Amino acid sequence: MKHFSVKRLLGLSSVLLVTLGASMHAQSYLPKHESVTLKNGLQVVSVPLENKTGVIEVDVLYKVGSRNETMGKSGIAHMLEHLNFKSTKNLKAGEFDKIVKRFGGVSNASTSFDITRYFIKTSQANLDKSLELFAETMGSLNLKEDEFLPERQVVAEERRWRTDNSPIGMLYFRFFNTAYVYHPYHWTPIGFMDDIQNWTLKDIKKFHSLYYQPKNAIVLVVGDVNSQKVFELSKKHFESLKNLDEKAIPTPYMKEPKQDGARTAVVHKDGVHLEWVALGYKVPAFKHKDQVALDALSRLLGEGKSSWLQSELVDKKRLASQAFSHNMQLQDESVFLFIAGGNPNVKAEALQKEIVALLEKLKKGEITQAELDKLKINQKADFISNLESSSDVAGLFADYLVQNDIQGLTDYQRQFLDLKVSDLVRVANEYFKDTQSTTVFLKP
């Protein structure tokens, strides 16, 4: 499951923990949602929260990410995210953000492997204007050369900052370069620097015309709202927008070949003083039934102060300054990723060895029922806590809507609470195999 936020309820009282534990199989706390599809194929989803805060979040989700790019044109989905805040038929470049700030809202966007997401967080009084702004960018984006060229340099600088000059950013990028050899997951959403510097406006317009269409988008409104009003205003602003191409949205055809052995890469980088390791294993795609158990393993192994990685590598053995795990849950064949940064004089190979040792312990069944019960209690506490925020609820729904798997979201909580120790042991043995591993060492 896409985790609702990095927030962890470390200060949760014992009374609340007991209460949650006692009602482990209580009713679903997931807020109800309503959905309509406009004549142009745009899906509109409303998730009313009965919190009387007056706060809403308006999202526009495009079913496109770096997964939809091709070799030589990497990073275009992310570039379009930047250009979407430039000029339109009726707005000057930067005016979108200025209008949002004037009515007291906050706007931003993100691009991942599988989704591009734009949002405005504001008061319910600004629902109409927020939808109007998003309809303007969807239907009337200019994409001009004099805006494209400077923004391309902004993105190149972002690549230097987040990837080239960041040890963990470089490690992350090189991991995907190594784990995937054919599929577009071979690169992360920022793309390769050479591609960034050689995009043309023609490339951008072609990508935009394919994927930024109403039939490939979802409008999601969460918070203190009335669903009927959401649908009426969405129809008012979006239904007149035309799809640019009546053909079906193209889907990536590049299927990653089956990995037939362990992969290892060593990266040496100037300015790196401590050693790092990224270790990952191929796991099934987003909708697979084992994803819930993999999520639980991610919590057990590498999330929070009591996780196995934190306890062993950071606190007990003092080998790492930080260590964590992440179940990526990508739309196509995915990865379960571990990253650890070594303390002075600690070799990356030693970090890898310790992570593998913990996995072998897990595969032998050395996890207790008490540990699993704690995972369930903490997961449910996180879940309930995040339902208080329109932003967190929007994030929760976004991935499942784009994957057309809202039933998966509905079932998730029950499936997590039904997990058995044997489920975690089975999944660990199924996927944490050396032949399916990719290891990248980052060294000075």
From Swiss-Prot:
UniProt keywords, alphabetically: Hydrolase, Metal-binding, Metalloprotease, Protease, Secreted, Signal, Virulence, Zinc
Coiled coil regions, renumbered to chain: none
SUPFAM superfamilies membership: LuxS/MPP-like metallohydrolase
UniProt keyword annotation of Secreted present: yes
Pfam families: Peptidase_M16 (PF00675), Peptidase_M16_C (PF05193)
GO molecular-function term, one example from the UniProt record: metalloendopeptidase activity
UniProt cofactor note: Binds 1 zinc ion per subunit.
InterPro entries recorded: Metalloenz_LuxS/M16, MPP/UQCRC_Complex, Pept_M16_N, Pept_M16_Zn_BS, Peptidase_M16_C
Enzyme Commission numbers on file: 3.4.24.-
Protein's UniProt keywords contain Phosphoprotein: no
Cofactors that this protein relies on: Zn(2+)
GO cellular component, one term: extracellular region
Primary localization class, coarse: secreted
Compartments, record wording: Secreted
Any GO BP: proteolysis
Positions annotated to bind Zn(2+): H78, H82, E158
Disruption phenotype annotation: Essential, it cannot be deleted.
Segment forming the signal sequence: 1-28
Annotated active site: E81
Summary of activators and inhibitors of this protein: Can function alone, but full activity requires the presence of the non-peptidase homolog YmxG.
Family the entry assigns: Belongs to the peptidase M16 family.
Role of this protein: Virulence factor that cleaves the cytoplasmic domain of the human junctional adhesion molecule A (JAM-A), compromising gastric epithelial barrier function and cell-cell adhesion. Cleavage of JAM-A occurs after Ala-285 or, to a lesser extent, before Ala-285.
Name the record gives this protein: Zinc protease PqqE
Species, as recorded: Helicobacter pylori (strain ATCC 700392 / 26695)
